[in-house]
């Protein structure tokens, strides 16, 4: 995302890829315009929030007309750097890591897992979903040219050590699937995805906030 647009709220920034994916599908279907209400129904974000999110970028639509799909597609493609390929590595080729490698961000044309790392000799030298698996001990030798993001799917006991090593190797962003809250330098961005916590939260909301 362009540096001048980083001042938008983080919650808004997280929704932009969701908007882009739906707008992309509208364009593929030949639709020429869309309203905030239609967007709301599709992405499950209320229309007022969508209008507020869009307002951070100026006049993207017209009152009474809605939004031009082609214009939105071009705008978000540029905003989300869709024409620039982002190389990603994955550390930990267990069950979850394997699933992510086989998926390999198939809906994100500009994001590709190029390398995977593990300590299991049976996995090293193989390919999972066309992604080669390398020896974790050879990380520094292989090098991470043009790679700034890592997906972390190692056992919890290895999470912090792995993160420390990734930071030293030049990684700037970590998508952390482990339950460990990583301690990293201030300039490193970490997004935590704890499936157990999300499931517990869902159970709680179902019990205490019925729809």
From Swiss-Prot:
Main location: cytoplasm
Keyword terms: Cytoplasm, DNA-binding, NAD, Repressor, Transcription, Transcription regulation
Protein function: Modulates transcription in response to changes in cellular NADH/NAD(+) redox state.
Subunit structure: Homodimer.
Similarity comment: Belongs to the transcriptional regulatory Rex family.
HAMAP family: Rex
Descriptive protein name: Redox-sensing transcriptional repressor Rex
